[in-house]
C-alpha cells in the first residue's frame, strides 16, 4: 500500500434514528405491556452523514415500524468508521434489519470500526441485521451496546463469519475485536415508612451481558475446542425479559448443526451458536426469534420483506 493511499481518509459515516409511539393515557408511568401501543410508531428523527442511510419505513404488521439500514458502498475498508445510534421512545416498537451482509475488506494497515448504540426506554426494539463478513486482512473493531430499562422488551443478534468458506476465501490474516454488551437501568427503591409506597431513589446502569471476542487470522482459538472449534461462523442472540420456560423452548430447536447453547442470565436469554457457515446460524436465530416473539414482544413473527428478495 503506497503512502498516498495510506493517508487517504476513509468514510466517516453516521446514522442517528429516533422512534416515537403514542403511550396509552392510562399508563402514566410509560409501562407499556405487549400489544398495548396506541397509534403507529413513527421515525421522528433521521440524521445521516456519509454513506449510511435508511430506506423509508415499512408497516407490514400495522403499528410496528420496520426499517432497513443500507450502506451504499457495499463494504467497509481500512479507515472507514461507521456509527449507528438508535433511540426507541416509550410506547414505540421498531424492527431494524439490513438487506445484505456487511462486508469488511482488507485494511492494509488501517483498522475499520463499527459502533452501534441501541436504546429502548419503555419500548420494544428488534435488532435483526444480516451477518458481518470479515475477509482476509481485515482489521476491525465492532461494538454493539444495547441499553434497556425494566419496561423495555428486546430481541436482537449479531452474527460474524470469518471469510467466505463456501468460496474458499478464508480469514487467515487480520485482527478482529468484536464486543457485544447489554446494559439495564435498574431503579433502586425504598418504602416510605408512613405508607409503605415504593419510591424511586436512584437509577443505576448495570451490565447484564458483556462479551469480548479477540481473534487474529493465526489465533489458536480458531481451532481449539475451547474456542471456535474450527467453525467459521459465530453468533449471539439476546432476548429480554425472558424466563426459564422460554429457554427450555429454544433448547428444543438445537439439534445437530449449528453447535449451540442457550442460557438465562439475570432475565436475559442468551443463545450462542457456531457453524461452518453463517447461513446455519442465521436460520437458527430466525427460528428462535419466531418462537420468542409472541411471548417477549407480544406479536406473531412477521418476516421483514427484504429477507425475501
Region roles according to the model:
Residues 160-190, 202-309:
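A structural signal for small-residue-enriched, beta-sheet-centric alpha/beta enzyme cores
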Residues 12-16, 64, 81-83, 113-115, ...:
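Broad gene-expression machinery/nucleic-acid interaction feature
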Residues 31-34, 187-203:
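Intrinsic disorder/low-complexity segments
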Residues 107-172, 180-181:
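Internal, conserved structured core segments that host functional sites
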Residues 1-131, 136:
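N-terminal, charged/glycine-rich beta-strand/loop interface patches
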Residues 41, 198, 205-207:
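Tryptophan-centered short beta-strand motifs
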Residues 16-18, 68, 85-87, 117-119, ...:
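Residue-level recognition of well-ordered beta-strand positions that form the cores
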Residues 93-95, 124-126, 153-155, 235-236, ...:
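Structural motif
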